[in-house]
Amino acid sequence: MTEPANNHPSPPPQNWLFKWWNSLNAITRLLVLVLGAPLMVLNARALSSIFGYFESLFVISLIASVIAFLLNYPVAWLEKQGAKRFVAASFVFLTALIIFTALGVTLIPLALSQAQQLVARLPDWLDSGQKQLVLLDQKAEILGWPVNFDGLIPQINSRLAAELQNLAGSTLNLALSLTVFTVVRLLDVLLTIILTFYLLLHTDDVWQSIIGWLPERFQKPFSDTLRRSFQNYFLGQLVSATCMALGLISGFLLLKVPFGLLFGLTVGVMALIPFGGSVGIVLVTFLVALRDIGMALQLLAVALVIQQIVENGIAPRVLGSVTGLNPFWVLISLLTGARIGGLLGVIVAVPSAVMIKEALGAIRSMKPLVPAPDHNQDPLYFKNQEEVQPLPPRP
């Protein structure tokens, strides 16, 4: 018997959420949006209050998780070479602890010393910047350029003096905060170290206990998406920031830029955050321009060349695409993370946005079980059935 021909194109499968939304009329959709928006705001407010109450616990857990996540890659490589998990985790953890301790003992005191010297010399740099503006105004007047800095110089003078006072106060507060941190928050540091080592030993067990709360069909996609998002972002930013700091420190020292170590480390640390490297370069260029505009232009040229080499040459070759997000959404996620969680929110904002993007894409492409077609509601089916002639009976 010939099967009936179906001329209707099969509709693309839809997720149950989209099917439910399409089944609503316009008034119901409006009511859902009107009632859902306040609930989302209340939930966000409640989550913010909970986060504020358990902020210390969340910060310790998140920092330990990120460090353990990054250290897990050399541990996994050592396991593939035949080492046991405990031996590999202990070796990697102790090596990382020694490296961080060495950096903290050598580079951080030098950077803090240069920061104190910079604050002490800023008034002299401010006077030098004013003199350079006066000379620039005189040259513009000689050349006949329609530029007048007479009214601008006093405004810049007062504004920079106010910013200098704020910077000095911020430096003093930072020093006091670091002192209080070393005395009061020592327990948090110890807890972070212990939790990092524990997570490094039992990464798979802890992770399986977390994703075990999800439905079984969501566990592997969620795990792969989260690992890929955080891996690409944190490793990408870490490689870029390290290369940026090393390159800038070397370039600044060759140019004999004052406080080259401090400026290179500052830009490198700021490069851990998207767009932070560019902001750091502009800030350092402005500070050096107060002392010498010619040196500032050389510094800017070297910094831009190193930044382009790192961002467009080294990082893509090592890790490929880092986020896959449009720069606009990267900026929005950073602002949102800063508003919700401060510095901690900025750190996890971009990988969280990447994970949300991947999750939404997975939901849209999800193929639910499509029920069998109901031929009772298809008039073309009966028409095709009438056109089909039955075969004659066998003799």
UniProtKB/Swiss-Prot annotation:
Keywords: Cell membrane, Membrane, Transmembrane, Transmembrane helix, Transport. It is a multi-pass membrane protein. This is Putative transport protein sll0063. InterPro entries: AI-2E-like. The keyword Signal does not apply. It is found in: Cell membrane. One of its GO terms (biological process) is transmembrane transport. It comes from the Bacteria. Belongs to the autoinducer-2 exporter (AI-2E) (TC 2.A.86) family. Its main location: membrane. The chain crosses the membrane at residues 24-44, 50-70, 91-111, 180-200, 245-265, 269-289, 295-315, 328-348. It holds the Pfam family AI-2E_transport. GO terms for cellular component: plasma membrane.
